[in-house]
Amino acid sequence: SNKNFTWTSNFNLTYQRALVDKLPEGKDIQYGDGEMYLHREGESMYTFYLPEWKGVNPETGLGEFWLDPEDHSKGVVNDYSEAGKGIVGKALPDVIGGFSNTFTYKDFDLSFLITYQFGGDMFDYPGYFSHHDGVRIGSMNLSEDVAGNYWKNPGDKVDNPMPIYANPY
């Protein structure tokens, strides 16, 4: 054992559950750009409330959204504004924490910290504008991973719909 050297480690974790307990008159509150967030009794704070993307129709090349995210049997729509909204995730992680080490030798110390989180979702807001099918002309250029990587022919199974200038859908 060296009296000039010490090594200290610390570990912590926190389970968080931030739920909306009560709202005035028990009514949901939608807020944020496009009312994309939802406060609802019993749900997590910062719940994402959005139309749910189904995918690209391989025959038409149009993007499809579920008409009712909570009941897929009601079918799909191509127009984002006609799609029903549903809970598609939450921003808050379930668990957060950290792990640190400190090494000390005489009057010199070296420390590092590693943080982590599990759970929670992320909404790529800039990506909302750069991954489009022509509907947001003039707002931003297409993202590099969309350029050339979209529906071209019937039967194509792709992630990005056919680009249509000033897309009415």
Could you tell me what each predicted segment is?
Residues A18-L92, D109-Y169:
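Surface-exposed, extracytoplasmic segments of Gram-negative outer-membrane nutrient-acquisition systems
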Residues K3-F5, N12-R17:
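Internal catalytic or translocation cores that form aromatic/hydrophobic pockets or channels
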Residues I87-V88, G97-S100:
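Generic recognition of flexible, low-complexity loop/linker segments
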